[in-house]
Amino acid sequence: MNWGEQVASRRQRVHEQRPLVHHITNLVVTNLTANVTLAIGASPVMAYAREEVADMARLAQAVVLNMGTLTGDVVEAMLLAGKAANNAGIPVVFDPVGAGATPFRTRTAQKIIKELHIDILRGNASEIASIGGFGGHTKGVDAAGAPARVAEMVKQVARDLNTVVAVTGATDYISDGERLIAVDNGHPLLTFVTGTGCSATSIIAAFRAVEEDGVTASTAALAYYGLAAERAAAVSQGPASFQVALLDTLYNLAGEELARGVKIRLL
């Protein structure tokens, strides 16, 4: 089965199995990520009360931890949900929003990674570089040669943390420390709508719920999402119409059209 067929197959699995994805996410993106999760055929739940997060995590097929709007209570809730998911064998996808921006965010990201088993770590290059101890090595990621450095960094962080790392940007890179894959689908309009990175994390979690291999799940999810962004941008006039078109395209994109449009490279 080639990559196009694998992407279409995993997208179909999500549609058929409708996995429940428990989100502890940030206040800015809750509505968009819930709607994206619904549009792809999965079921979102957005529960963050400490009194119920462990119970909710055990009901889910995947758990998303997103530290975008961080408080002490949110950190505690994420740890409770993550430990419950770990004990039940439910995959945890962690989005370390803003890691490296403040000491609190950096410490929190490190604490979550230390105390939980993270199946997939999804972030941008600077967030993952901060977590991996690469400091400012991703400064100027659009400069000549920078994509190669980002790819190497992704593979090294995945190896060091013994997890799957997915870095999203103009090109997405996915690695488990051994395999390294690039996804070239996407569109610049994604950067003009708040929550599109967080939505990528939600889609990865839904795909991981129906696919045991984290590299395959992340690659398929990001190729599908990136192609949907390309199709949505083609019928949009700007960020507002793009957001609506993106939800519609995620809902409709499947099968042969999806398989033919993905741009995936093995590195």
Curated annotation (Swiss-Prot):
Main EC class the enzyme belongs to: transferase
Q: Which domain of life is it from?
A: Bacteria
Q: SUPFAM superfamilies given for it?
A: Ribokinase-like (SSF53613)
UniProt: substrate binding residues: M46, G195
Per the UniProt entry, the Enzyme Commission number(s) are 2.7.1.50
- Pathway(s) annotated for this protein in UniProt: Cofactor biosynthesis; thiamine diphosphate biosynthesis; 4-methyl-5-(2-phosphoethyl)-thiazole from 5-(2-hydroxyethyl)-4-methylthiazole: step 1/1
> Cofactors per UniProt?
Mg(2+)
Q: Does Protein transport show up as a keyword for this record?
A: no
Q: Which residues cross the membrane?
A: none
What InterPro entries does this protein's entry cite? Hyethyz_kinase, Ribokinase-like
Q: Which reaction does it catalyse?
A: 5-(2-hydroxyethyl)-4-methylthiazole + ATP = 4-methyl-5-(2-phosphooxyethyl)-thiazole + ADP + H(+)
Question: Is Transferase found in the keyword set?
Answer: yes
Gene Ontology MF term list: ATP binding; hydroxyethylthiazole kinase activity; magnesium ion binding
List UniProt keywords, sorted A-Z: ATP-binding, Kinase, Magnesium, Metal-binding, Nucleotide-binding, Thiamine biosynthesis, Transferase
What single Pfam family name could you report for this chain, choosing any that match? Answer: HK
Binding site residues for ATP: R122, T168
Q: Which GO terms describe its biological process?
A: thiamine biosynthetic process; thiamine diphosphate biosynthetic process
Q: Which family does it belong to?
A: Belongs to the Thz kinase family.
> What role is this protein assigned?
Catalyzes the phosphorylation of the hydroxyl group of 4-methyl-5-beta-hydroxyethylthiazole (THZ).
Q: What is this protein called?
A: Hydroxyethylthiazole kinase
* Originating species: Moorella thermoacetica (strain ATCC 39073 / JCM 9320)
Source lineage? Bacteria, Bacillati, Bacillota, Clostridia, Moorellales
Query: Which gene is annotated as encoding this protein in its UniProt record?
Result: thiM
